[in-house]
């Protein structure tokens, strides 16, 4: 009787844990960008945040959604991509408005010019939306034509998670080039590391496609490498640290 009562209690507890993990998976990825968004709004200065972070995450999550049509995976991972896309669009909108307001003599640059020198440096948020829609349309059409190819679908999934996994590499390279982590927020990197570790464990425990687990592990390794740089360059400085960058740019460049 006691065992039955305990079992009755454990079933809803297991469901609550599952729902909590799914919720953390869906919304956890955007948490680091909330203080960054608030900081940009408060200071009206977006120089410390690279909009290329938005580009990488938009491409990665659009490809992940397209991958879902070829091979269904956990619903929380699909909703995570939707939430991240909306978050990055909000970040782009704010950054564009702030930059245009601060640059009085800004020459208007539009997506329809197709000028590679000004790519992702346009004057209006609408141009970024046009670019995202164009990429989604082209990638979606190619996926529609190739959806029956298992090789294409698996490659699409790999490209999606590999793109996201490479997000920390520019920071890793910047630290190595300057032989310093001055201006980089250690708290942010720790947050990325814990988030990527949780995400990878979620992939492994829920039987997500292999690409997700492999690239999740790669993300964790990149995060740990950045933390290793912070330890080495702080403990054994090789040269005077360069001018401090804005903490919000930690994973941007």
Swiss-Prot record:
Pfam families: PQ-loop. It comes from the Eukaryota. It is a multi-pass membrane protein. GO terms for biological process: phospholipid translocation; retrograde transport, endosome to Golgi. It comes from Bos taurus. Keywords: Membrane, Repeat, Transmembrane, Transmembrane helix. The chain crosses the membrane at residues 7-27, 49-69, 72-92, 125-145, 150-170, 214-234. Signal peptide: none annotated. This is Solute carrier family 66 member 2. Residues 14-80, 160-215 form the PQ-loop domain. Coiled coil: none annotated. One of its GO terms (cellular component) is cytosol. It is found in: Membrane. The gene is SLC66A2.
